[in-house]
C-alpha cells in the first residue's frame, strides 16, 4: 500500500482471507496479468510438470462462502489462466484443490468450465483417513465412508491425493494416523494404498509416503532414509513400487477410470465383516479388488458375480514378502454356480486380517444348467416387466375415461 490504497487486493471486508493473507482483486487487469505471469514463470523458467492451485474456493466464492455468492471476476480469471496454460504448455497438468461443490471445475473452458485437468478429491482423502483411524469395533458404523466417494466421483475428473498437507502441523504421517499397534498399522497401510490404487482416479503421493514415514515432514531436513534398515519399511517401499507398476501395467486400473460403466460394486454391504469388493473394467480386462478392513480373517468369503470366471491373483497385501502373515500359496480360483441379488455365480476367497487381494478375471463359458437357469430368470423378468407395463397402460386408459 504505497499510497495508502490497496494495490493487489480489494478495499472492503473481502480484502483478507481467514489466514490473514490478502485476496487478489481479479477485476483489475494488471493484477490478473501479474498472476498469469507468475504461473508462466513456473512452467517456462523452472520447467514444472504442472501447477496445483490451493484453496480455489476462496476465489470462486467471496471469502470462500457460497452464501455470499460467486466471485465472477475470479471465475473469469481462472478460465483465462487455464486456457492460456493449456495453449502454451498442453502437456502440463493443472490441478485444483477445492472442497466445494462448484460445478464444472474440470470441464473444458469451451464448455463454460473452469478448465482444470483434475480436482483433488478432498472428500475421499478425509473419509479414507477417518475410517482407517477408527477403532476396529467402531468401523461397522463408519462403513459408509469408504463407499461414499463413488456416489459423486463421476461429477468431476477427480485425483486422489495424500499430499504434504496431510503430514504436517501435528496431523501425524499417514501410517501414524492409522488405528492399532505397530504391526496393525503396517498391515493397514498396505491395504490403504491398495484401496487408493484400486480406486478410480489418478494418484498423487507426497515424498516419504512410500517409506512408511513416522516423522512429520520438515522442510529443513531430508527424509529418514535409515528407516529402510527396518524390515517393514524396506518391504513397504518395494510393495509401493509393485503397486505402482500394477497400476501402470493393468489397463483395467486406468482405462476408463472416469467412465461409470467401468466400475461395479461386488460387496458394499458387509459392514460387520468390514469387507469391500469391486470390479474395475477397461480395455477388455476385468479386475476384482477385495479389501478386508477388520482385524479378523474371513475364510471362504463369498463374492457374487454376474458371469462365470477364473481368477488369477495379482496381489496379496499380506504376502510374507511384504511383511504379511498370509503364508498360503496363490492358486487359480473359479466361480461356482449359484448366487444372490440376481448374480448367478459365486467366487469364494480367503481374506487375511487387514489384508486385500487383487484378481484378474477371465470369463468362462457358463455350464448348460446355469445358462438355462439364467435364461429362465431373464424371461421371468421380461414377463414381469411386460405385465407391469400392461397394467400401467390399463390404468392410464381407465383414468382417461373417467
Task: Give the role of each language-model region.
Residues 330-371:
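C-terminal beta-strand-rich structural cap/linker in extracellular carbohydrate-active enzymes
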Residues 47-49, 61-220, 248-303, 307-317, ...:
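Conserved alpha/beta catalytic core and glycan-binding cleft of carbohydrate-active enzymes
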Residues 32-35, 39, 74, 78, ...:
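Aromatic/hydrophobic pocket-lining residues that form the small-molecule binding cavity
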Residues 395-396:
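Short, low-complexity intrinsically disordered segments enriched in A/P/G/S/L with frequent Arg
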Residues 232-253:
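Catalytic cores of secreted or luminal carbohydrate-active enzymes
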Residues 1-70, 333, 382:
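Substrate-binding/active-site clefts of carbohydrate-active enzymes
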Residues 1-17, 21, 134-150, 323-324:
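Core domains of carbohydrate- and sulfate-ester-processing enzymes
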Residues 309-341:
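Trp/Gly-enriched beta-strand surface patches
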Amino acid at each position: 500500500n504505497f499510497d495508502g490504497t490497496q494495490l493487489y487486493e480489494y478495499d472492503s471486508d473481502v480484502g483478507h482471507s481467514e489466514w490473514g493473507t490478502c485476496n487478489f482483486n481479479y477485476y483489475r487487469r494488471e493484477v490478473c496479468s501479474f498472476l498469469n505471469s507468475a504461473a508462466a514463470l513456473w512452467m517456462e523458467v523452472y520447467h514444472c510438470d504442472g501447477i496445483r492451485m490451493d484453496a480455489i474456493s476462496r476465489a470462486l466464492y467471496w471469502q470462500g462462502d457460497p452464501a455470499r455468492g460467486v466471485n465472477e471476476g475470479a471465475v473469469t480469471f481462472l478460465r483465462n489462466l487455464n486456457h492460456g496454460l493449456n495453449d502454451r504448455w498442453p502437456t502440463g497438468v493443472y490441478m485444483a484443490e477445492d472442497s466445494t461443490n462448484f460445478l464444472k471445475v474440470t470441464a473444458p473452458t469451451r464448455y463454460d468450465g473452469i478448465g482444470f485437468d483434475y480436482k483433488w478429491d478432498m472428500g475421499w482423502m478425509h473419509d479414507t483417513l477417518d475410517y482407517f483411524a477408527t477403532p476396529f469395533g467402531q468401523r461397522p458404523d463408519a462403513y459408509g465412508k469408504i463407499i461414499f466417494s463413488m456416489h459423486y466421483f463421476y461429477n468431476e475428473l477427480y485425483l486422489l491425493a495424500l499430499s504434504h498437507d496431510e503430514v504436517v502441523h501435528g496431523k501425524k504421517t499417514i501410517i501414524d494416523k492409522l488405528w492399532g499397534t505397530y504391526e496393525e498399522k503396517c498391515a493397514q497401510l498396505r491395504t490403504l494404498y491398495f484401496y487408493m490404487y484400486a480406486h478410480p482416479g489418478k494418484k498423487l503421493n507426497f515424498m516419504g509416503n512410500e517409506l512408511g514415514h513416522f516423522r512429520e515432514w520438515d522442510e529443513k531436513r531430508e527424509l529418514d532414509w535409515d528407516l529402510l534398515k527396518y524390515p517393514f519399511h524396506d518391504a513397504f517401499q518395494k510393495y509401493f513400487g509393485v503397486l505402482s507398476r500394477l497400476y501402470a501395467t493393468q489397463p483395467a486400473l486406468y482405462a476408463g477410470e472416469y467412465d461409470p460403466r467401468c466400475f461395479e460394486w461386488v460387496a458394499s454391504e458387509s459392514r460387520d465383516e468390514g469387507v469391500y469388493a469391486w470390479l474395475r473394467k477397461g480395455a477388455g480386462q476385468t479386475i476384482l479388488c477385495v479389501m478386508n478392513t477388520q482385524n479378523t480373517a474371513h475364510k471362504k468369503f463369498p463374492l457374487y458375480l454376474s458371469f462365470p470366471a477364473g481368477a488369477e491373483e495379482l496381489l496379496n497385501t499380506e504376502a510374507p514378502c511384504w511383511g504379511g502373515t498370509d503364508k498360503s500359496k496363490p492358486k487359480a480360483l473359479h466361480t461356482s454356480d449359484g448366487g444372490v441379488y440376481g448374480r448367478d455365480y459365486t467366487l469364494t476367497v480367503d481374506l487375511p486380517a487387514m489384508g486385500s487381494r487383487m484378481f484378474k478375471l477371465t470369463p468362462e463359458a457358463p455350464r448348460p444348467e446355469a445358462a438355462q437357469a439364467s435364461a429362465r430368470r431373464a424371461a421371468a423378468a421380461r414377463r414381469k416387466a411386460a405385465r407391469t407395463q400392461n397394467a400401467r397402460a390399463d390404468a392410464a386408459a381407465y383414468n382417461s375415461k373417467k
